[in-house]
Amino acid sequence: MTSPPLPSFEALLARDDVIWMGQNTTHLEPAPEVLEALAESTRRHEFQVYAPSAGFTELRELIVADLELPGFDAWVLDGAVAGLHHLCMTLAPRVSRLITSDPGWPWPGRFMSVAGIPVTALPVYRQPRRLLSAAQIAEVIEPRSLIYLIDPLNPLGSSYDAVELAEIVGVARASESYLIHDATYRHFADNHTLAARLYPERTFTTYSFSKWLGLAGLRVGAVVAAPELLADVMAVPANPLGAGIQAQRAAIAGLQVRDRWLGVLRDTNRRNLGAVEQVVAHTGAGSVVVPQSQANFLAIDITDTPWHSDALCTAILDQTGVFIRPGTYQSPLFGDHFVKVSTSVPPDWADQFCAAWRSVAAR
C-alpha cells in the first residue's frame, strides 16, 4: 500500500498548527538562563566571529563532567550528526565493516556506504530485548570493524544494561574493532552505562544538545574520547572554524542548570510516555514496542491494525496537525509495522496526540 509522502520539514515549518512529535526534539519552554545566553551573545554580536576549532574550553569541560568521564576530552561540532559523519569518514580507511541495527538511525550506514565500506544492519525488532546482542555481532564481525550502538535505541527506546554492554565490548576488543556509542538520549534513561569506561582505547561517545536541552535548530553537539584517540581523528577537522558561538553559549548555560532542567524535563517526559501508553492500551489500536521507554519517544506496533505506517502518519497529520514519524524512515526491514511518537513536549501536545490516536488510528 502506498500513501502520499509526508510534507517536507520546510513545508511543516510554514504551518502554525503543527504539533511536533516526530523528531525526538524537546519543545518545552527553555530555561531562562539559556534564553538569556542567546540574547546576550546576540547583543554582543558574537555571531560575527568564529569560535575555537574544538569549541570553548568551558563547554568541553562541562560535557566531559556531564558524562562523568574524567581524563577524557570533547570536541564540539555543529551537531552530533556532524561528529558521526566526521568519524565515519575518518575511520573508513581503517575499518573493514560497519555493524549497526535495524531499526536504527540510517545515516552512519549511508556515510560508510558512500566511502565504500560494507554495512551490516542486524535485525533487533523481534529480539527479546529489542537491542543488538553480543552473539549477533560476533557472528558477523571482522577484524577492525566499526560497531555503532545507539543507546537508548532510536526509534524503540530500549537501552543496554551494564552486562550487555560489557559483552559487546568484549567482542569489539577481541577483534580490535572501534565502537561508536551514540548517547544522544542518555539523559532520559533511568540508568545508563558508557562503553567508554570499559573500552576507552577505541570508543567514541557522541553527545547531542538537540534532545535533552532542546537546541536542535542551533546545531551543537560533541564527540568525546580518550585524548590521544580524539586528537588522532580530529587532526583534520571537518569544520576548523568551529561550531556556532551562540549555540555554544546556550549549551554552556544549559549545562550550568542541568540538574534543575532535567528534573522538569524527565518528569514531563515520563508523564507523556504514560499518557501515550495508556491511550494505546485503552483503544487496542496497536501495542507499545518497548514499555517504559528509556528515551523521549516510543514506538507503537501497528501490525495488527488495518494501517501501514506511512498512511497512518499522513492521516494523523492531515486530520489533526499532529506530526509523528513512520517506521519506514528508520527500518527497511520492519518500518511498515510501527510508528514513532516523541514525548518531550508540552503535556497538552501529548494529550492532543492521544485524541488523534483515538479518532484516527482506532477508528
Task: Give residue spans per PLM region.
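Conserved glycine-rich beta-strand-loop-beta hairpin in the small C-terminal domain of fold type I
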Residues: 268-277, 288-302
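Active-site phosphate-binding strand-loop segment of PLP-dependent enzymes
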Residues: 126-190
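PLP-dependent enzyme catalytic core of the Aspartate aminotransferase-like
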Residues: 318-323, 330-363
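PLP-dependent aminotransferase-like
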Residues: 89-149
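A short helix->loop->beta-strand "cap" motif at the edges of active sites that frequently abuts
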Residues: 96, 117, 174-178, 201
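Conserved core segment of the aminotransferase class I/II
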Residues: 205-270
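N-terminal small-domain helix-loop-helix segment of the aminotransferase-like
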Residues: 1-82, 86, 363
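Short, conserved charged micro-motifs
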Residues: 306-312, 348-353
